[in-house]
């Protein structure tokens, strides 16, 4: 369906603002839930940009963005819930305490970064293709900038999980929260499987 010029412009402005502001806020977040929420705002901006294109390729990119964020968020939230992690400091040394939950969080972070072989990369690629196809080169540039911001906040999670030691003894995977691990791992597998397809 064709979008009117005014509607397309409004969606493009809102999407651009959301992508930039969400990415900047995610970089500065000190809480895993807030980081994921801000990353979600950035993803929502990419969805709005995709819809603003008003083309079948744009709508396909929007749908892929939604699926990509759903998988990444579930992997992050489930992996964190399995070890009752909320503050970023609690991720220090998490790779040793909770290897499966850490793997889920890692895949979620890589997908948010738009790393190759993940659904996040595929979603960003589709948006870049749709933007370039419509002559919106600036939108493609904005997606690349948002991906670079994702490298900072996603990379920070991975660095804490595998390359830092915890100052305090936090819990590992276990207890009633272990139930969150299964959907997190399924989401991580989906993120990789679709990325490889």
How would you describe each model-predicted region?
Residues 1-122, 129-150, 155:
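Hydrophobic transmembrane alpha-helices and their helix-loop junctions in integral membrane proteins
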Residues 96-103, 154-197:
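Cytoplasmic/organellar membrane-interface segments at the starts of transmembrane helices
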């Amino acid at each position: 369906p064709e979008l009117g010029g005014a509607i397309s412009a409004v969606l493009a402005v809102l999407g651009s603002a959301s992508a930039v502001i969400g990415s900047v806020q995610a970089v500065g977040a000190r809480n895993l839930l807030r980081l994921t929420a801000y990353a979600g705002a950035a993803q929502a901006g990419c969805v709005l940009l995709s819809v603003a294109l008003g083309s079948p390729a744009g709508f396909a990119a929007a749908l892929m963005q939604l699926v990509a964020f759903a998988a990444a968020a579930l992997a992050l939230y489930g992996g964190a819930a399995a070890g009752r992690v909320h503050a970023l400091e609690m991720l220090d040394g998490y790779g040793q305490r909770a290897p499966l939950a850490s793997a889920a969080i890692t895949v979620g972070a890589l997908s948010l970064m738009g790393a190759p072989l993940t659904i996040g990369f595929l979603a960003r690629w589709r948006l870049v293709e749709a933007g370039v196809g419509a002559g919106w080169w600036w939108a493609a540039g904005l997606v690349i900038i948002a991906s670079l911001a994702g490298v900072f906040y996603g990379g920070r999670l991975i660095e804490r999980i595998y390359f830092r030691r915890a100052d305090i003894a936090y819990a590992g995977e276990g207890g009633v929260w272990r139930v969150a691990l299964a959907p997190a791992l399924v989401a991580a597998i989906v993120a990789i499987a679709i990325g490889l397809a």
